[in-house]
Regions:
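Nucleic-acid endo/exonuclease domains
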Residues: 3-199
Length: 199
């Protein structure tokens, strides 16, 4: 014996009621210092007009040999420019984002010092942004900047940070700073050469 039970189909007047509940979203505030768990393996750098102008007006005009977007592989970060005090070496060159520079991969490039060109808003220049009013992006950039500072300190590489305001308004000051760091690089080079000589 078979029994058939007639199921009532919902109609316009007779709708099947379902209980709808809103899910509570436990949204935690954004923490710029905490990793999101995603590994950035193919991180790309961004090229700004400020970096192009700096390379053209300060580095190329003064005949400095540099790597553009020098990668510190152990922290997966890029420094804007790596300068060497060994210009007499014939380095393999490349063009990166319109900037002619030394190719980092496949050859030895002795770094005398590194340059970071920091925008006033994004890296929170005290002349532009008040310390207490930083947004999460600015806090994250400050954290990354401190990480880069520590990396340079651990590897005994001088780091020159140049603000956008100084590049646009105080070019003589910027040139003076670069020349001071070049002098440091040449002194370091002479000490290394002196150590290698037989005494």
């Amino acid at each position: 014996m078979e029994f058939f039970i007639a199921m009532r189909q919902p109609t316009k007047n007779n709708k099947v009621k379902t209980k709808k509940t809103k899910k509570k979203v436990n949204k935690k505030p954004f923490n710029p210092y905490k990793s999101s768990g995603k590994k950035k393996t193919d991180q790309k750098y961004g090229t700004s007009k400020l970096e192009r102008d700096f390379a053209r007006d300060f580095l190329e005009k003064n005949g400095l040999i540099f790597v553009y977007q020098y990668e510190a592989k152990d922290i997966s970060r890029y420094y804007d420019f790596a300068i060497t005090a060994y210009p007499e070496v014939d380095y393999e060159m490349e063009v990166k984002d319109g900037i002619k520079c030394v190719k980092q991969e496949g050859q030895y490039f002795p770094v005398s010092f590194l340059i970071e060109v920091d925008g006033g808003y994004f890296h929170s220049d005290p002349r532009v942004v008040k310390e207490g009013k930083l947004n999460p992006m600015q806090k994250h950039n400050k954290f990354v900047d401190s990480l880069k500072d520590k990396w340079c300190g651990m590897h005994c590489i001088p780091l020159l940070r140049i603000w956008e305001y100084d590049i646009r308004n105080n070019p003589d000051y910027v040139l003076e700073q670069i020349n001071n760091y070049i002098d440091i690089g040449y002194k370091k080079k002479k000490k290394e050469e002196w150590r290698k000589k037989p005494h």
